[in-house]
């Protein structure tokens, strides 16, 4: 899970400073972030659905991975529904002040959630600066 970096922030700010990005443009940013992944990683994500949620999600959540990380799968893992990565459009825009910041935060959030698919937990991501 990727949470807002502001300690204690449990809801989106209502200060009129939230940048607005059209849904289609935001989705393009997510696609660009995914396209920026190395080809080898992309091939290992064939059974992962990446979606954008345009309504506010759980408080403070930028992205969410739901599924069984590759490191936890056994030989019995088969026939499962795709894992899912959700990127929360309103939450990301709420912490950004410029379009460039939105692009960078989308990229960081996508990489963060993809890392969970590969079995990297939040503690290790924090150690790595993600």
Named regions from a protein language model:
Residues 1-105, 117, 123-126:
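Active-site rim/adjacent substrate-binding subdomains
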Residues 105-113:
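Short alpha-helical catalytic segment bearing the HExxH-like zincin motif
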């Amino acid at each position: 899970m990727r949470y807002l970096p502001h300690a204690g922030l449990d809801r989106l700010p209502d200060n009129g400073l939230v940048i607005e990005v059209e849904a289609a443009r935001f989705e393009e940013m997510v696609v660009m972030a995914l396209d920026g992944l190395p080809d080898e990683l992309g091939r290992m994500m064939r059974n992962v659905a990446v979606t954008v949620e345009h309504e506010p999600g759980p408080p403070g959540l930028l992205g969410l991975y739901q599924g069984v990380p590759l490191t936890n799968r056994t030989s019995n893992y088969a026939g499962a529904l795709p894992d899912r990565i959700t990127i929360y459009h309103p939450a990301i825009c709420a912490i950004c002040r410029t379009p460039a910041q939105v692009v960078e935060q989308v990229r960081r959030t996508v990489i963060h959630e993809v890392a969970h698919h590969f079995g990297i937990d939040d503690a290790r991501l924090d150690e790595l600066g993600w």
